[in-house]
Amino acid sequence: MPPIALLSVSNKEGLIPLAKELSIEYGFEIISSGGTAKTLQQAGILVTPVAEYTGAPEILGGRVKTLHPKVHGGILAKKGDLFHQKDLKDQKIKAIDLVVVNLYPFQETIKKPNISWEEAIENIDIGGPAMVRAAAKNHESVSVLTRPEQYQPFLQALKKGTLSNEMRRELAKEAFEHTANYDNAISRWMKLNAEKKSSQWIESIPLKQTLRYGENPHQSASWYSHQDQGWGGAKQIQGKELSMNNLLDLEAALSTIREFGYDENLLATTSQKAAVVIKHTNPCGVATANSVSLALKKALDADRTSAFGGIVAVNSSIDLATASELKNLFLECVIAPNFENDAKLLLSEKKNLRLLEMNKYYIDQSERNNIRSILGGLLIQESDDELIDEKSWEVVTKKQPSSIEKKDLTFAWKVVKHIRSNAIAIASSGQTIGIGAGQMNRIGAAKIALETAGDKAKKAVLASDGFFPFDDTVRMAASHGITAIIQPGGSIKDNLSIEACNELNISMIFTGRRHFLH
């Protein structure tokens, strides 16, 4: 009796060569359903339609094709089990040796604009996952292929006679991963369209890359990413392989630069170009200007010592002038919406420098959750990426900030939310001039930021990610010449800070919004 292959695929890539080789070279009888059978018949390949084999027609508009004992009995029967073989014989069921199935394109369907609920639901495969799971369960007797990339290795194993149980077990593992990813895509889509939060967190993300190591050389690390979201859509156009530390810093850089708009067409839509320099996930320099090259220069000038070996992000296309500034620096990575051709050519001389293009589409498609692992579980929160709402701000001092101060306060507030707590940012003329990050007390963060700013702190503004528990930060700021402050407010001793500001002729804004970052 010839071996039997059941073929039912949505992705027809590689289908005809596979079926021809199975049929001609190895004598497989091919059973197939629907569009797959039609494709094979048009290619001149002998096929037994599923409906002909089972004696049951497709019903419910194609919703039921392969859900039949003659299909699932043939897949699930163990070859070495006499009782199973007797059942097959009694029921006139053929044992199936190979299942080649990939599923309805649900993930592709839900990417379409204005997709209806009904269309998405109709692209949820039922029979396909059932066959894949059945074959994977019975992998000692049945091989299962779920991706075109598996076809040639499988045929090579057939040719060499090396189709081992170990290979079938690996194919079974990949099959269960395939159906798990599929079910997760459906679950995620329904979750996004549901009003209530899910009682379980289910996520299935494919492996993109095994990294050289983690934060330190003795730690192993891997990178998992959706291909159509976030970093899965980033294009590395040159440079060494990304490390885990690179990715963490790039995430911090992208989160910060998005505060100022991020678009490859930004040159035509706004005059606010921005540049960010990141070191160990903290901004060490941020600036805005009328050109990307000037914004970059200002961001670097904020703290050139810390910028050494850092990550740079800009929010618009990198032109030749910007590339000329970058060429003279030692940096790990540069990320932008786009690199102009002459900029690419110039930077290609720095072969180790990693250049990445990130299209705004992939950022917008990302589900914005912040996930942290703890012992035995996960902590999941919404990402702190809401836009600034200045209407909710309140000037709580007698002195009002000037228009120039207000502009710098807004700038500093955008930056400070991306600095590790306790965080202080000092800014002047659209440029950070002092940053205090990750301190155990707020006055300590302010001291670092003010000392970094030096004489530039005179007539500058200060932003704090959390409230002032005492008036000591205000008084220290005043002693260095700070003229305006922005902070969340909310301390039971807010009045002390307000009184100190009034005494020292400093304006202060309460935003009503805290931005801790741990």
Curated annotation (Swiss-Prot):
CDD domains: IMPCH. It comes from the Bacteria. Residues 1-146 form the MGS-like domain. Keywords: Hydrolase, Multifunctional enzyme, Purine biosynthesis, Transferase. InterPro entries: AICAR_Tfase_dup_dom_sf, Cytidine_deaminase-like, MGS-like_dom, MGS-like_dom_sf, PurH-like. PROSITE patterns: MGS (PS51855). It catalyses: (6R)-10-formyltetrahydrofolate + 5-amino-1-(5-phospho-beta-D-ribosyl)imidazole-4-carboxamide = 5-formamido-1-(5-phospho-D-ribosyl)imidazole-4-carboxamide + (6S)-5,6,7,8-tetrahydrofolate; IMP + H2O = 5-formamido-1-(5-phospho-D-ribosyl)imidazole-4-carboxamide. GO terms for molecular function: IMP cyclohydrolase activity; phosphoribosylaminoimidazolecarboxamide formyltransferase activity. Pathway: Purine metabolism; IMP biosynthesis via de novo pathway; 5-formamido-1-(5-phospho-D-ribosyl)imidazole-4-carboxamide from 5-amino-1-(5-phospho-D-ribosyl)imidazole-4-carboxamide (10-formyl THF route): step 1/1; Purine metabolism; IMP biosynthesis via de novo pathway; IMP from 5-formamido-1-(5-phospho-D-ribosyl)imidazole-4-carboxamide: step 1/1. GO terms for biological process: 'de novo' IMP biosynthetic process. SUPFAM superfamilies: Cytidine deaminase-like, Methylglyoxal synthase-like. Its EC number is 2.1.2.3, 3.5.4.10. One of its GO terms (cellular component) is cytosol. Belongs to the PurH family. The IMP cyclohydrolase activity resides in the N-terminal region. This is Bifunctional purine biosynthesis protein PurH. It comes from Prochlorococcus marinus (strain SARG / CCMP1375 / SS120). The gene is purH.
